[in-house]
A protein has these predicted regions:
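Conserved single-residue anchors adjacent to enzymatic active/cofactor-binding motifs
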Residues: 1-204
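Short, charged alpha-helical interaction segments and adjacent helix-coil junctions
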Residues: 1-6, 71-80, 166-278
């Protein structure tokens, strides 16, 4: 059964609020990126709210939490609350989708922007205790050689905020963990969250999203049960058919027919029939 928080209990570390705050407050989103990445950003734009990228027919699409651009960089910010062993593969897939979305037909590869895939996790995905894991492609034979493909993946482990030396990052990670603002920026985040909660239209939006998700969950559960029943029936038929072939082969063996002819008659392999004679 799916569980949804009450609207009044939502925090910045819940997906609805996380996306709402960063989508509707461009200055806050830009400041967050600058704090996490330690870079200066001129401005950001939102290519599409709740961007879904699916470049090929029947390919797996991806819905990005927060997808923004500046003049020569693209950023995907993902909030991850639940344990997930697939984060490394998800970063690879998200990266490929960003590239497909940002290189038009006829453009040169040199026009690809620098991309950042950022995961903010409420757990340590690699169990090494680091507050930040940064990945870039390097040469195994010469670690000093960076591939320079302008692809950077940063995974933040909020549970290790106490050992993060950068005070801005530490304060943000702590806020993700316990929702207690400890600096001006997290105070601003907390204030925006409370303002969002005061508007009834946001509450209705959140509730309608939950109804949609709950319907999808129930539909998927029903389809899964039906598929399981169908597979069980097919498996039973298959097993029954196999057993019938074996019984037929046993009867034919008592009639002194050749193993080759029995194999042709039943569809069993010669090896299977030889096993019945032992």
């Amino acid at each position: 059964m799916m569980y949804f928080k009450k609207f009044e209990d939502l925090t910045f570390a819940d997906h609805y609020m996380f996306e709402k705050v960063l989508h509707e407050n461009q200055d806050i989103c830009q400041e967050l990126l600058e704090r996490l990445l330690k870079i200066k950003i001129d401005h950001i734009t939102y290519p599409e709210i709740e961007k879904t990228i699916s470049p090929y027919y029947e390919s797996k699409g991806v819905r990005l939490d927060v997808y923004v651009k500046d003049s020569d960089k693209i950023f995907d910010i993902e909030l991850q609350n639940a344990l997930d062993d697939n984060i490394p593969l998800r970063t690879r897939f998200y990266q490929s989708m960003l590239d497909c979305d940002n290189l038009l037909k006829g453009q040169d590869y040199s026009e690809l922007p620098t991309s950042f895939v950022i995961f903010i996790c409420k757990f340590d995905p690699f169990h090494l205790g680091l507050p930040i894991y940064t990945f870039q492609n390097r040469c195994d034979e010469n670690y000093d050689l960076v591939l320079s493909d302008k692809s950077i993946k940063k995974i933040f482990n909020a549970t290790s905020f106490k050992i993060e030396k950068d005070l801005e990052i530490s304060a943000f990670l702590q806020y993700i963990c316990n929702q207690k603002p400890v600096d001006d920026f997290t105070e601003k985040l907390s204030s925006i969250v409370e303002k969002i909660k005061k508007h009834e239209v946001n509450k209705k939006e959140y509730q309608s999203m939950n109804l949609h998700d709950r319907d999808n969950f129930r539909r998927g559960l029903k389809e899964g049960i039906e598929q399981g029943i169908s597979q069980g029936i097919q498996q039973g038929i298959s097993q029954g058919s196999q057993q019938a072939k074996i019984e037929t082969a046993k009867n034919l063996l008592t009639m002194s027919l050749s193993i080759e002819n029995i194999a042709k008659a039943t569809g069993l392999s010669v090896e299977d029939i030889n096993a019945l004679t032992k």
